Amino acid sequence: MVVAELQTKVEKYETKASRCEQQARDAADKAEQSFYQVLAGYYGSLAKDFRKILEKRLIA
C-alpha cells in the first residue's frame, strides 16, 4: 500500500469512530449506547493500527 492509501484509511476509520462516539452519546438506551461505544473502540483501534503502519512507512 502506498502512503496516500494508508492516510486515507486512517482518516476513514477516525471519522467512523467519531461518528460512532456521537451516536453513543445520542443513544436512546444503554444497549444502543454500549453498541456504539464498542464500535467506536473498534474503529479507533483500526485507525491507530493504520497510523502505526503509516509512521513505519514514513520512517523507512
Question: What would you call each of these model-derived segments?
Answer:
Residues M1-E14:
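Short, charge/polar-rich alpha-helical segments
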Residues T15, R19, Q23-D26, K30-A60:
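Short, charge-rich amphipathic interface segments used for partner binding and complex assembly
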